[in-house]
Amino acid sequence: MTSSMSPAPAPAYAQVMEDMEKGKELAAQLQGLLRDSPEAGRFVDQILHTFSRAMRALDKAAVSAAGGEGSEVQSEVTCGGGASAGGKRKAPAADRKANCRRRTQQSSGNSVVVKNLDDGQAWRKYGQKEIQNSKHPKAYFRCTHKYDQLCTAQRQVQRCDDDPASYRVTYIGEHTCRDPATAPIIAAHVIHQVAAGDNDDGCGGLQAGSRLISFVAAPAAPVDAAAAPTTSTITTVTAPGPLLQPLKVEGGVGSSDQEEVLSSLTPGSSAARGGGGGGGVAGPFGPDQGDVTSSLHWSYDAVAGMEFFKNDEVVFDLDDIMGLSF
């Protein structure tokens, strides 16, 4: 009776496993097409995980059934016709699952043989394991920007057995990240704002002639010294770091209460610190309209005397800074 019932489950088991493997491969291909959508990629990952878990559960059920009256059926399915005795029947099943995983990975990746591993991308190694019937281990890499830019690109590297100087590299997915070194430099620019009374943004009644300086991303423009009027307030900020472009000069002429504000971020300059050699131009004006040349030097001793402003917005009023010495 056992021999008459044993052939029945074998085709059903093989058909179920074949369909699930096919569905898993299709889900892996779909994952490669949805790399640009992190949310869709997470759903595909869950689908692949569900397929793998169902296949493992089906294998366990088949192994449990093999311990009873269907032992010869499990031997036929896992060994492919080569019957084995005792607990050795589980080893071919494990090999078959490993082969399924390898086929899935190869179907969604592109393999190349190279001499140099430097491909111009930023990779981080997260694992390595020994490969059966291979002399060299396989290393697993992910994109460095997996978490900050949600880039899911991966690569696998293994030294070739027949040519140790060459590497077989398998790329899975495509890079969707951007190198931070190519990002636009954040520069400061001057926003011209003249307001009377209270404002909706909570600045609280700027007087005419006030200047609101906001440090946000904007293209810098060269300063035309000849076009600047005689009455001006020049602010020079000296700080360590790369050279930034001069800030844009904005302001109107024709009104006595609208002086020009010129800000520039440059490395340390002896002329700016000394206040001579063209640092300030004396004008034929009274004490209430004189030129103010200020130089801010960045140091740890000077930090204690500095006032920090909320939201990186600083309001300079000419009536408040007249006569101050920096």
UniProtKB/Swiss-Prot annotation:
Induction: Induced by abscisic acid (ABA) in aleurone cells. Induced by salicylic acid (SA) and infection with the rice blast fungus Magnaporthe oryzae. Induced by benzothiadiazole (BTH) and salicylic acid (SA). Induced by cold stress. Down-regulated by drought stress. One of its GO terms (cellular component) is nucleus. Keywords: Activator, DNA-binding, Nucleus, Plant defense, Stress response, Transcription, Transcription regulation. GO terms for biological process: defense response; negative regulation of abscisic acid-activated signaling pathway; negative regulation of defense response to bacterium; negative regulation of response to water deprivation; positive regulation of salicylic acid mediated signaling pathway; regulation of defense response to fungus; regulation of DNA-templated transcription; response to cold. One of its GO terms (molecular function) is DNA-binding transcription factor activity. The keyword Transcription regulation applies. Expressed in aleurone cells. It is found in: Nucleus. Residues 112-180 bind DNA. Disruption phenotype: No visible phenotype under normal growth conditions, but mutant plants are compromised in benzothiadiazole-induced resistance to the rice blast fungus Magnaporthe oryzae. Enhanced resistance to the bacterial blight Xanthomonas oryzae pv oryzae (Xoo) and the bacterial streak Xanthomonas oryzae pv oryzicola (Xoc). Enhanced resistance to bacterial pathogens is associated with increased accumulation of salicylic acid (SA) and jasmonate (JA). Residues 67-114, 252-288 are annotated as: Disordered. Residues 273-283 have a biased composition (Gly residues). Belongs to the WRKY group III family. Plants overexpressing WRKY45 exhibit enhanced resistance to the rice blast fungus Magnaporthe oryzae. Plants overexpressing WRKY45 exhibit increased susceptibility to the bacterial blight Xanthomonas oryzae pv oryzae (Xoo) and the bacterial streak Xanthomonas oryzae pv oryzicola (Xoc). Transcriptional activator involved in defense responses against pathogens. Acts as a positive regulator of defense responses against the rice blast fungus Magnaporthe oryzae. Acts through W-boxes, which are cis-elements that are enriched in the promoters of several defense-related genes. Plays an important role in the benzothiadiazole-induced disease resistance by mediating salicylic acid (SA) defense signaling pathway, independently of the disease resistance gene NPR1/NH1. This is Transcription factor WRKY45-1. It comes from Oryza sativa subsp. japonica.
